[in-house]
UniProtKB/Swiss-Prot annotation:
Protein name per UniProt: Orotidine 5'-phosphate decarboxylase
GO CC entries: cytosol
Subunit composition and interactions: Homodimer.
Class of enzymatic activity (EC top level): lyase
InterPro entries recorded: Aldolase_TIM, OMPdecase, OMPdecase_AS, OMPdecase_bac, OMPdeCOase_dom, RibuloseP-bd_barrel
NCBIfam families: PRK00230.1 (NF001273), pyrF (TIGR01740)
Organism expressing this protein natively: Shigella flexneri serotype 5b (strain 8401)
Gene (name only): pyrF
Transmembrane segments: none
Length: 245
């Protein structure tokens, strides 16, 4: 992977890989991070780690050269969501997300909160349908649409509100690229190299399949974080993606 110029101290990578950090111990997380290269991936920090370790943990990762996807899935009244997104921008993260099911007014308020940050604003992404959810889960909530149809409806609302893209399953990516265009970014969890276990993600795909489907950023967790050689695993994934491009 190659580096491009950055106005910050952080490296910028053109790899589509985002490694999901899921650690209960800060030292263990940093020990893992120190084994990998910020030119090979970005990092995702979710609710558990951010609650445990706070903004300073994000700064520690940024000081090591990594761009951060702050995966907190804000879902609140418009004013509160807007302030939360602005706080994430102040922290200097690369990407932040909200729940599309929070509605148009909430998403619009979040987008408008980033206007003062200009080119330094993070990408603002909306979550459609969690990849662990199946049709039966949606039915329990009173949603009669299939996961794919419901995700597309929420993605259309997201684009209408002017956000940068959505989190979606890899299976939805092909249609979403056709419907919403190349500039609408698709972020996909549940990506696992061939031979990895499915874990708690129901709708999964390999990195090569995800790239072919139109995924812009692919989130990979345990296949990298639990690898005996995570640096080599990342390089192998990126090499396979370059061959597939």
């Amino acid at each position: 992977m190659t580096l491009t110029a950055s106005s910050s101290s952080r490296a910028v990578t053109n790899s589509p890989v985002v490694v999901a950090l899921d650690y209960h111990n800060c030292d263990d997380a940093l020990s893992f991070v120190d084994k990998i290269d910020p030119r090979d991936c970005r990092l995702k920090v979710g609710k558990e780690m951010f609650t445990l370790f706070g903004p300073q943990f994000v700064r520690e990762l940024q000081q090591r050269g990594f761009d951060i996807f702050l995966d907190l899935k804000f879902h609140d009244i418009p004013n509160t969501a807007a302030h939360a997104v602005a706080a994430a921008a102040d922290l200097g993260v690369w990407m932040v997300n909200v729940h599309a099911s929070g509605g148009a007014r909430m998403m619009t308020a979040a987008r408008e909160a980033l206007v003062p940050f200009g080119k330094d604003a993070p990408l603002l992404i909306a979550v459609t349908v969690l990849t662990s959810m199946e049709a039966s889960d949606l039915a329990d909530l009173g949603v009669t649409l299939s996961p794919a149809d419901y995700a597309e409806r929420l993605a259309a609302l997201t684009q209408k509100c002017g956000l940068d893209g959505v989190v979606c399953s890899a299976q939805e990516a092909v249609r979403f690229k056709q419907v919403f265009g190349q500039e609408f970014k698709l972020v996909t969890p549940g990506i696992r190299p061939q031979g990895s276990e499915a874990g708690d993600q129901r709708r999964i795909m390999t990195p090569e399949q995800a790239l072919a489907a139109g995924v812009d950023y692919m989130v990979i967790g345990r296949p990298v974080t639990q690898s005996v050689d995570p640096a080599q695993t990342l390089k192998a994934i990126n090499a396979s993606l370059q061959r597939s491009a």
